[in-house]
Amino acid sequence: MFSRYEIPGHPFAPIVISCLLIYLASIWGLGRKRNLNAGAGTKPKTSEKPKEKKGLGSKGKGDAMTTLPTQRVSSQDTERISAFKSLLTGLPTTSSVPASLATIGVNICLALFSLDFVFRGLILYPTENLSFSRVGHVSSTSARIFVREPNKNLPIRVSYQEIDGLGDGRPMKAGTLYSLDDTSDYTSPISISGLKPSTKYRYSLSNNQSGVFYTAPQPGSPGSKQLRFISSSCIKPNFPYRPFSHPFRIHGVDILTSTLEKLGSSLRPAFMLFLGDFIYIDVPWRFGSSVKHYRDEYRRVYSSPSWHVSPDSPANIPWIHTLDDHEIANDWASGNITAPYPAAADPYLHYHVSVNPPIPRNPHAIASNTTYFSFTHGPASFFLLDTRTYRSRPLNENSTMLGSAQLQSLLEYILYPEPEGVKWKFITSSVPFTKNWHIGTPDTWGGFLNERHELLSAMWRAERDLGVRVVLLSGDRHEFAATRFPDPILASTSTPESFSGPGTGIHEFCAGPLSQFYLPVRTYSQEDIEDIAIKYVPDGNSKFGSISIATDKVNGEEVSRMNYSLYVDGKEVWRYSLVTPLVKKRRPLPPGELEMDIVDSWASRFEGWTLHAREKLGLVWRVIETCWDEMIKIGR
């Protein structure tokens, strides 16, 4: 994404070390030259006395003299300027030994930080003995649990019990795992069935792993009219880098956990749609491309202390995963046979696909080879695309991102009439559907415009004929953007004002990263009236979307309302609303509405900075505030 190499991609580590060695060599050479000059008795040049000119018509010693002006700079001033320049630029100086030592120390520390980021987790925190469990897809009557256990604690007995406000129910046996081996990296999915809808359960394993989950509501029940879930993409442990943090800590997951805790249990998401780049095999350094190397990366992420927090671990939220390029290689478009895809697919299948939702009703492919998924939860159905496994090279007339089987399955899903009460169709893509990003566009749907148009045509038809709303969710970009795609049949009667901002059409919300970097370079802009820009939020190292659906009334008519809330670094900064009538009517769907926007509020941004500083600095911040108040008093 963005470029040929991801930041901080694998070219950067050797460049940093090479630059340090060159820098230290130049320091050594400069010091050696200075010593040689000192040994040869070389003295620094001194300033000459000012020359005197005789005045016009002068005749002797007593004649008037004029002195040419000269500027004298003391050696102390020269040293001070040189020291400042050395500290500012990092260049060595012969005029100030302390400044040179300081700048050398800073450069060595920065290089050591780079080595620490690359190697500390690899060397000091081995992951082969990771024992871990998490919740996968949960339906109204079943749940999937992922478990990894390499420590010979077999067999593993699985039990579960109902939890309510009156106490825990009687433990029920769900089965036993008798063997785990290296063929699956000591992992296995566990299926629990026969559950009650809309119920909280605790699962327990005999290897001391446990967790909780909530089953989905029964279709057609009052609870099935509501839904809340979250969506994001892209995580890299301990990046942006913090030297005193655990090398596997995922700062964005910590922010997500604390944000959800503040929202309360009533606003708990039913699941997380994580849209790719769960690992970065080539960031900051690709150690290899074997199955072992890819498995190592998954284990490092799951070894993070960010998963092990109380009272409610993020591992208790059902994480549903799709594949993107950094689980394979940057901007991957070489199919599912070319190396390193087979090695990359191994841990993805074991760690994620094994507990993902079921495959579509008609996948048009062999079930064991299908890595796209579909499910229904309450008022919404979902289709999770695989945009990497089947894609061809972009920018050709017949370029395909999905492959023929997945494309056919998706078209059938879009035009399939949903059961009563299901008013939303969500389609997830690991890369943006819009072509408004102007860097790396061929890696997005902008490189597959013919296939994109075929899908948009089907979506417009579904909204016109089926009375459902189609929403696109995507990731990959370390930025947020909301875009809409107006139906050309309806747009022909639109006013020029409708070709910007909120309005009608298929809507896409692209959010990321959950825990990565962002760039100060602006790369998203509207260029035509096909992709209408609604909102662009590039800043923030942690972004996720919270999507909520509930019934509402508009002008006396009962509707299903979806709110998309964007959270940046733990704070809600933007909210957008879409509605669809509960009673099917053959008419255009209402336009989207902006509910909240404080992204460009400098007062709000400054308030957020001060609150963050106050929280992090504690006593130091209070001292700063006190000193500031005293300075104001003195100024008065």
Residue spans of the language-model regions?
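Metal-dependent phosphoester/phosphodiester hydrolase catalytic core
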Residues: 1-636
